Amino acid sequence: MRRTIADLISDRYYGTLDSLCLDAGLDFTAQAIGNALNIVGDNIQAKGRVQKPQGEFWAYQTEGSYDIKEASSAAHLYGKRVASAEAFTDAKFSHSLADLKNLADYALAFGSNEFVVCASAYQPWTDKIPGNTGGGRHYCLNRNNTYWNYSCPFWDYQARCAGLLRKGIPVVDLCVYLGDNPPVKLLSYRLPEMSEGYNFDVCTTDALINRTKALDGDIVLPDGMKYRMLVLQKDCEMTLAALRHIAALVKQGVPLYGDRPAYPVSLAERMHDNEYDKMVTALWGTGKKESGVHSLGKGHVYWGMTLEEALRKEEIRPDIILKSGNEPEDRMYFTHRHLPDVDIYFVNNHSKNVFSDSIHLRTDRRYA
């Protein structure tokens, strides 16, 4: 039932609105379904039903927001050029443009390439400064802010970055499958420990089955984008159809990382327990070893080890090698776009510390 509800929200609500907007010659962007877990939906599928999937980041989210990672993932998976983001929400007058730039940079590094600024344009008074018409929220991005008349270079920078990050094809090594147990969204505690130097997208069953195929050991999308490895989130619950598709990918050489599922996610599929168990055994082998590697066709399945170990065994080199600080907040984020004659890397030093180090890029292009 929950899967049916999620499909209806994606197709009949967001899909219908998207069709109506297309017929009327309008763009349609939506924060589908947003951060809430109280809606029985599929965030990636729903975002894939709109012309411009949108996430959001708030000024207090200094360590990043995975909502924008969902939006950029949906844009990549469903072949959409723009991954939008509600930007700088609740930024206060005490925030400087330097503070806002660091927020913008991590959003760009998470895959956003359009900012819809959260601000209140309605400010009719000329004698009330700084003035606030945001219903209790701080909306500092208006003409009464002391830096407003000097902020053009800040906005020009955002426009240039967004323009560059719409060019070419995204380069993302890892596709993390979130399973099929609505509500489905990216939850950080269910992600494996992500190895530095590798970027990732997240997908759900609709995109996995209907948009991906295997080619030369990679997961390939219709527009030519590819992933090097399929990764299962922790305690990943999946349908028999998803399991079949994953097995087909592995047989054709796609490496898989993650633990074996215990049983079908849907009660309706319990009548197919025998086939489900056979598929699990084909992928993970007999017995229940805590860690191991199992071969199926041309591909390998890894579990019980770190993701970094599995990537090393598959000889998938980091896309970028750079220095991060010793503190959790001293992170480096990046995104990468591939063009016929050049690679575009955008790197965000997401800290207030200055690092001096060499950066190694995985590219054979003359220009990067």
Could you say what each language-model-derived stretch is?
Residues 1-368:
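Carbohydrate-binding surfaces of carbohydrate-active enzymes
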